[in-house]
Amino acid sequence: MKKFLVLVIGVLMSVIAFAHAPLISVDDNGDGTVYIEGGFSNGTSGEGVEIIIVKDKAYNGPEETFKGKEIIYKGKLDAKGSITMPKPATEKYEVYFNAGEGHVTSKKGPALTAAEKANWDKATASFDVGEWKELMLEK
């Protein structure tokens, strides 16, 4: 009986541990912007969760880093758990959904193409990237 009870408790604990795994989607809108949506596997919204975009290569310089990579943008998801924003100018980047220790996941983002450049210029002019402008636009 004791072994059975320990087994049941173990199974329940593992189900609880995986009940709210973080999820992220990074979709290419084809117009120089990306749609980022985050949430949890139990259906909870990612509203207010921090989004971090990093260059997809190791970095050991003076700029702020996350997981050993240079941060080029930090922001938060809106009330719908999403954000539509211009693609970073860097060729390779990764988007992190950072809901705290043990609740971090990431996905590589689509690169900006030459065909999207005109639309991207408009998107970057209207989207407020705040203090991250130089890093996002590589200026």
Predicted segments with their positions:
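Glycine-centered loop-to-beta-strand initiation motif
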Residues: 67-87, 91
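Beta-strand-rich domain onsets/edges
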Residues: 18-39, 117-139
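Short, aromatic- and glycine-rich surface loops/edge beta-strands on solvent-exposed regions
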Residues: 89-103
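Sec-dependent signal peptide recognition
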Residues: 2-10
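Exposed beta-strand and adjacent loop surfaces of beta-rich binding modules
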Residues: 33, 48-50, 92-94
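A short beta-turn/strand-edge loop motif at beta-sheet boundaries
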Residues: 42-47
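Short amphipathic beta-strand segments in non-cytosolic proteins
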Residues: 50-74
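N-terminal signal peptide c-region/cleavage motif recognized by signal peptidases
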Residues: 14-16
